[in-house]
Amino acid sequence: MLRRLFVSTFLIFGMVSLYAKDLEVSVRSENTLLPIHVELNIGPNDAKQTKYLRSLCSIFVKDLALGDRLQPLLVKSGEISAPFSIVISSHYPELVFTLSRGTHNPRPFHSLVLTEDIAINRQKIHEVADKIHYALTRVPGISSGKIVFSLSKNPHDGELKQGELWSVDYDGENLRALTQENSLSITPNWLNIGSNNPYFYVSYKFGIPKIFLGSLENTSGKKVLNLQGNQFMPVFSPRKKQLAFISDAYGNPDLFLQGFSPSQGAMGKPRRVLNESFGTQGNPSFSPDGSKLVFVSNKDGRPRLYIIQVDPEIQTPRLLTKKYRNSSCPSWSPDGKKIAFCSVIKGVRQICLYDLSTGKDYQLTTTPIDKEGPSWAIDSHHLVYSAGNSGESELYLLSLITQKTNKIVIGLGEKRFPSWGGFPNNQ
């Protein structure tokens, strides 16, 4: 039985800044995997503890492989032969992670103390796996983030549709209800700032859609704006402290900007970015530096993607892609080099990618089921999106490196509007 202990996760000897430089590897090709052997050294534990430690080790190996750059393999004691190795030593409830490169002397890299809370222990394993992934590749690991999404079930005759926000790990574990508003909550979007993992979302609990601020620590949403009309699709730039959203406060669904601080709330008055003559706007997404927005407009008839500079001055929008004319849900990658979006191709909404460096766009998915809402992981090489039809929808992971998809098995219900974030700022 796990004992209740004070949670302590710490770095040993400042190894991330020092030893990581010795361990760093340049993976030249995105299709090249670095072999790593993982060994679990278990002390004199009872059978239940041994089984639990092995399950945590399996999670660790899966976490390392998630980024599609490392090829971890769990081996028995004395069988390590890969260029890099990780030994997990159990001094229950403490786990020590030791890294070795070739014949170099092994050095302790990280240590953690297990608690009796399985969810906390899983998160600790995710975080150490991501730290090691970053130390070896200089690419952020992606197993420690959270995916927040809207989960709804088909209403009975005459009932209004309801949906609450939930969070889940990439592997479908640690499923947790966030809102309990008995209403419809949609389009959550991480702020990627602060230690309490805040996110914006839209709720219909007051009758018409308004923007609220929630967090993993405080799930009771707080209304953000005192603005008339419907409010939709909030996104935030932590660099510029700006909230972008869509509102019909002046009659037409337009793009707005609002200064915002998680601690102080809205700062100043919202600014309308475009006038009504430009058409109907939707789906804004900030560039990483917060100077630009990509959004959807139907000013030319069909919804298409546009980019507009909003800082230091608002400029005229420009058309992003001419290849696809029925586009939606753009999402700017954290590295600033790519924009994922949806477009209707041969009658099916598919996930596509626009490369800002080349000006070319690509179709990423091909299956005959509608997809929507792509959201980036912190490494800019993996996406989560929803796929389904009216009344049913599931979440999927997509790797740009392998071009493979993987369903997140959650259970019954319609899952939509995923947002991948909440990554610890420790890589």
Curated annotation (Swiss-Prot):
<comment type="similarity">
    <text>Belongs to the TolB family.</text>
</comment>
<dbReference type="GO" id="GO:0042597">
    <property type="term" value="C:periplasmic space"/>
</dbReference>
<keyword id="KW-0574">Periplasm</keyword>
<dbReference type="InterPro" id="IPR011659">
    <property type="entry name" value="PD40"/>
</dbReference>
<keyword id="KW-0732">Signal</keyword>
<dbReference type="InterPro" id="IPR011042">
    <property type="entry name" value="6-blade_b-propeller_TolB-like"/>
</dbReference>
<feature type="signal peptide">
    <location>
        <begin position="1"/>
        <end position="20"/>
    </location>
</feature>
<dbReference type="Pfam" id="PF07676">
    <property type="entry name" value="PD40"/>
</dbReference>
<protein>
    <recommendedName>
        <fullName>Protein TolB homolog</fullName>
    </recommendedName>
</protein>
